[in-house]
Amino acid sequence: MNKKVEGLTKETEAANYLSEQGYQILARNYRCRLGEIDIVARENGYLVFVEVKYRTNVEKGFPEEAITIQKQRRITNTAKYYLLVNRLPESTPCRFDVVVMLKEEIRLIKNAFDAYGS
């Protein structure tokens, strides 16, 4: 399976997992000139921007370690753009979650980082 197909398959698994956890999926693979967000969802009054990271092993580190400060900034800027084009107020409660997939294990990290890159 090529990387793109595998990535889409894992994102589908992550979206299904989030749905089972009570998330309402609003968009997948949201793209704009600033970047991409794997999943946009609603959960408990929050608009949640979700990054999905998958690895088959930890030779190159754990999946969540691939979310660098630069990647966080790209995601948060894309999220701000999403709010703007969807005419949502800046005061909309937002959160940045990460779905980590290592082999067959799926783990959800809520509030993994904030809009300030920490």
Curated annotation (Swiss-Prot):
Q: Which domain of life is it from?
A: Bacteria
Q: Which residues cross the membrane?
A: none
Q: Which SUPFAM superfamilies match?
A: Restriction endonuclease-like (SSF52980)
GO MF terms here are: nucleic acid binding
Q: Which family does it belong to?
A: Belongs to the UPF0102 family.
What NCBIfam families does this protein's entry cite? PRK12497.1-3, YraN family protein
Name of this protein = UPF0102 protein Cphy_2398
